[in-house]
Amino acid sequence: MAMNVSTTATTTASFASTSSMNNTAKILLITLFISIVSTVIKLQKRASYKKASKNFPLPPGPTPWPLIGNIPEMIRYRPTFRWIHQLMKDMNTDICLIRFGKTNVVPISCPVIAREILKKHDAVFSNRPKILCAKTMSGGYLTTIVVPYNDQWKKMRKVLTSEIISPARHKWLHDKRAEEADQLVFYINNQYKSNKNVNVRIAARHYGGNVIRKMMFSKRYFGKGMPDGGPGPEEIMHVDAIFTALKYLYGFCISDYLPFLEGLDLDGQEKIVLNANKTIRDLQNPLIEERIQQWRSGERKEMEDLLDVFITLQDSDGKPLLNPDEIKNQIAEIMIATIDNPANAVEWAMGELINQPELLAKATEELDRVVGKDRLVQESDIPNLNYVKACAREAFRLHPVAYFNVPHVAMEDAVIGDYFIPKGSWAILSRYGLGRNPKTWPDPLKYDPERHLNEGEVVLTEHDLRFVTFSTGRRGCVAALLGTTMITMMLARMLQCFTWTPPPNVTRIDLSENIDELTPATPITGFAKPRLAPHLYPTSP
């Protein structure tokens, strides 16, 4: 019996071994087949694009110098974004190709071509450039927005969409945002009580800073703030550093295109970004480190804000999903990405509305009709505030926060708008050019909210890319809901709670642009007078 068992076992083992070998052979054959098919497809694509490169021309553009391309023009004609805009205007084109060093930069101001890139060829243009400023701000590419298309990006984007910026999380954080909407009214009302004008830029930027700090850290201030509800020195440093970093990130730095010059800082941008990044981290990281320790020690057991969510995320083995560096850098990127768009749109919208009282009156009338004058406007009212949202949407169109969107790098050769775009090219959508394109927008320089009104609900997203709000595609902003909420609530509270006029002795708000960025040259300032019953205004911060 023992011999039979042994023989059977030997036979079974032999059969298993043979079966295993057969399976291995099958796997190898399948793998080989897939590899051959993939290679054939790649070769066909390569041949197709080689043919395309012969059949389709490169986009028009200035003649590059040998080796350095159009770097001399980039340096000579600062700010570079205005030179590019004028170049495209002079060439009468909605797409061009400018060579900086070995990099092909492709600005686009046509919505049809923009949709080709972010919709039809979204997968091809999903990469990001590797440059020093992006590497610095992301802690070595640990985040989402500026990170190349790789596994780290996929991991962090999944965290954001499923755990941080989801509709359920948005609802969970409602009360924190509501506190900051009340705080905004408290601050502006105190300016009136002190007979001061309201600097809308300060109010808007620090509302945004307060909201994201409250959602992230459960605190409005790093320090004590000011008695009137305004920002303290720490908050001013924080927000100023964020806007400085944004100004120089993808700011046509010489070393972005001639990387062998990295570290020499020939145009001074590298040092500026490093210092701004240090300021942001010096204020935020101690809070993050303290909270991580509280969870590790068991001192903290309940989630209260987004920082708690980041820290308590677990992988399939029950271990922390994110390490401290990933948490710190992703939080820094969220801070940088949250404040600028809402603040810029509201500042410009308020300037335009104060200068056009008939439009301001229509927005106020809508608020009185939808909300009434017996309570303050709330997030639940947003779907019904079409005119208010149209005012914000028109500010996005006419006065974008940045000249260009974050670059989309081509991961392979492509044909866009009947032009050949080589692999490695940076496609940059011109927010300025798209929103002011006369082929898309009649009378494009006129601020006219009513061009956005239709029979349905007005939304701030713009998937047809006739202008850029939160972009679209796999590299689009994942926080459109939060952005829409912040912008609409900020603008609605300002308009519902106060009557706005130019400051005393001023007949019209100056709406000229800064030379080196797209903010108003002079911060929008107005005189705000309460228009509701006194008991509706918050009396404490």
UniProtKB/Swiss-Prot annotation:
The keyword Transmembrane applies. GO terms for molecular function: heme binding; iron ion binding; isoleucine N-monooxygenase (oxime forming) activity; monooxygenase activity; valine N-monooxygenase (oxime forming) activity. InterPro entries: Cyt_P450, Cyt_P450_CS, Cyt_P450_E_grp-I, Cyt_P450_sf. Keywords: Endoplasmic reticulum, Glycoprotein, Heme, Iron, Membrane, Metal-binding, Microsome, Monooxygenase, Oxidoreductase, Signal-anchor, Transmembrane, Transmembrane helix. Heme binds at C477. It is found in: Microsome membrane. Coiled coil: none annotated. The chain crosses the membrane at residues 19-41. GO terms for cellular component: endoplasmic reticulum; membrane. SUPFAM superfamilies: Cytochrome P450 (SSF48264). Its cofactor is heme. Belongs to the cytochrome P450 family. Involved in the biosynthesis of the cyanogenic glucosides linamarin and lotaustralin. Can use L-valine or L-isoleucine as substrate. Catalyzes multi-step reactions starting with two successive N-hydroxylations using L-valine and L-isoleucine as substrates leading to the formation of N,N-dihydroxy-L-valine and N,N-dihydroxy-L-isoleucine, respectively; following spontaneous reactions lead to the production of (E)-2-methylpropanal oxime and (1E,2S)-2-methylbutanal oxime, respectively. This is Valine N-monooxygenase 2.
